[in-house]
Amino acid sequence: MLEPEYLEKFSDQLLALVDALSTAIIADMSKRLVKTGEITETSRRQAEILQGAGLLYKDVLKRVSQVSGYMNTEVERVFEEAGVRNLKNEAVIYKAAGEKEIKLHQSETMQKILAANVRKTKEEINNLTLTTAVKTQSAYITACNKAMMKVQTGAFSYDKAIADAIKEAAVQGTEVLYPSGHVDKLDVAVRRAVLTGVNQSAAEMNLQYVKESGCDHVETTAHSGARPTHAVWQGKVFCVSGKDSRYPPFYESTGYGTGAGLCGWNCRHNFHAFFPGISAPAYSQEMLDDYSARKYEYNGKKYTEYELSQMQRSQERKIRATKRKLTGYDAGIKNTDSNTLKAELTNRFESESAELKKQEKSLKKFCRQTGRRYESARTQVHAVLDSEGNIVGFNKSVAQKAVWASKRHTSKMQMVK
């Protein structure tokens, strides 16, 4: 069994790597945008845009290759960690019932289950990540064409049009393309893949444990903030075979094995062995009712844990979007030869830095008032590049620049007043 709290945070380091890849790709796109130059002839402009798009496509593939090794290693690590943790948690229940303990490194069957899920998840993440090259190339062409139209109509100067293009590309972020045609943000896709993969791996291990021990009952985990369709079966005992009429059937009741059910897409519920007459239920009805109660107050209103979690995620997404814009502006400042464009981008960088400070202050206040934990792991990581522009590590350089830029912006505003 894997605890919901563990499943919420176990992939943070992997997602930090994904965020670093995203910001590196945005920086590459920004570099290409500021190098386009002012060409008024449409045919020449289109030729240059397509050439830049081709080079950017290669840039993205290079970035993916630089980070994929880190990501694959991290995927292997989290699966191994989760597998050991899962079986240790199960062992406590089995030993209490007089059953033998199964350890991951002593069970060939459990190791095969883990290895198969690691392989499947790595392939899914690698395939999805590669599609970012196509989506980024498309976003670049769209951004260039919009900038060209703005300049040609006389509505915007070249500098403002390019700065807008960088902003739009950064806000859109890196996206992946599923075979079905569905488009998602890269970090969302990776989180879904690794959470689902790890949880399903643990679930398969637990069912194998049940099979080997002869246990026929399981209890699902429960957590506050569960989606309504999952809240109806969380924290309850089920019969795996469906033969014990005292308990509802496991598969039919929880939807296990389907994307929308237990251990499906983005699900943080798991389950553990339960021995009637020996095991004590982990959750009382009072506890389950409390999980879905509107007991949290914020700005004079009552909210459930689920509602607060969605509010926090929304604020965190805005912070990441702002940091992507800062990355784009920063790359543009470093790579443009135009003093006027550099001035435009610098002004925007300072203004956006002040906005970032407000957003982070607002999120900290929200977490303080609602008793939630302020998550900063993902918002602090950025790629470190060597002299040739290759990703060789991670640091907080852009974040620190934003702090100083925010101070400069505040000073300017005070002078205006």
Describe the function of each predicted region.
Residues 1-164, 286-417:
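N-terminal leader/targeting and assembly helices and adjacent pre-domain segments
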Residues 184-288:
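Acidic, glycine-rich two-metal-ion catalytic cores of nucleic acid-processing enzymes
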Residues 125-213:
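Contiguous, non-catalytic segments that form substrate-binding/exosite surfaces or channel walls
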